[in-house]
């Protein structure tokens, strides 16, 4: 793959909770040999750090200061991306719906988003970047060479989240989980600052009736059309 003007190539993968964007982004980063940015994990880490430090979740200034002290990295170790915060591996579970809802609420604060916007853009380094989030293609990297928006029916997304949480021994009620996902969708899609919407030039992919491999193959085909041959 050849790129002009020394511009770092970026693939953005946006979508709601449970759409499969995290799995797809990690696989694309591995196949392409590029760096990974999972913006949702950064928000979740910020929420957990705020809880651990007894910081008021409604205190925007305190959250902004806390975020400025956090350094997150995604390291590919044996074909699996491991998350580090301030050079320490994140071992506690940050993928619960409780933490996810806190992260979604934190994302409403303009000052926090401003700090995160600048920080997320520091991940844009060669050989390339796969950025996973909700506003990667619209706000953070609007000039990305490839933009993908992944979605799925709420029931399917809720079941995926249920399966994911049960694997790490979390007991969750399906109806409650579905309700939480709908609530989060509403908050993410209707917020005034960086709402969850597909970029106008995004490849919109509905994964409701697709397997992980089918989603991956469709995404790779789209990337090939945009940037050239990929060996995988």
From Swiss-Prot:
Cellular localisation: Cytoplasm
UniProt name for this protein: Cytidylate kinase
Organism, as annotated: Blochmanniella floridana
Pfam family name, one: Cytidylate_kin
Binding site for ATP: 15-23
The organism's place on the tree of life at top rank: Bacteria
GO molecular function, one term: CMP kinase activity
The enzyme's E.C. designation: 2.7.4.25
């Amino acid at each position: 793959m050849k790129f002009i003007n020394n511009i770092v190539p970026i693939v953005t993968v946006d979508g709601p909770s449970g759409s499969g964007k995290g799995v797809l982004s990690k696989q694309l980063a591995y196949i392409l040999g590029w760096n990974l940015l999972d913006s949702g994990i950064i928000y979740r880490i910020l929420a957990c750090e705020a809880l651990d430090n007894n910081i008021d979740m409604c205190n925007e200034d305190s959250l902004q200061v806390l975020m400025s002290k956090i350094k997150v990295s995604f390291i590919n170790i044996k074909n699996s991306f491991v998350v580090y915060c301030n050079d320490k591996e994140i071992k506690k579970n940050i993928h619960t719906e409780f933490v996810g809802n806190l992260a979604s609420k934190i994302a409403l604060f303009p000052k926090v988003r401003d700090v995160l916007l600048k920080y997320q853009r520091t991940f844009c380094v060669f050989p390339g970047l796969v950025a996973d989030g909700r506003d990667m293609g619209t706000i953070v990297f609007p000039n990305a060479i490839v933009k993908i928006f992944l979605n799925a029916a709420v029931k399917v997304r809720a079941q995926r989240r249920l399966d994911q949480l049960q694997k790490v021994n979390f007991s969750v009620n399906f109806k409650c989980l579905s309700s939480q996902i709908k609530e989060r969708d509403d908050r993410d899609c209707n917020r005034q600052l960086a709402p969850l919407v597909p970029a106008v030039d995004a490849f919109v992919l509905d994964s409701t009736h697709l397997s992980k491999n089918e989603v991956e193959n469709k995404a790779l085909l789209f990337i090939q059309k945009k940037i050239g041959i990929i060996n995988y």
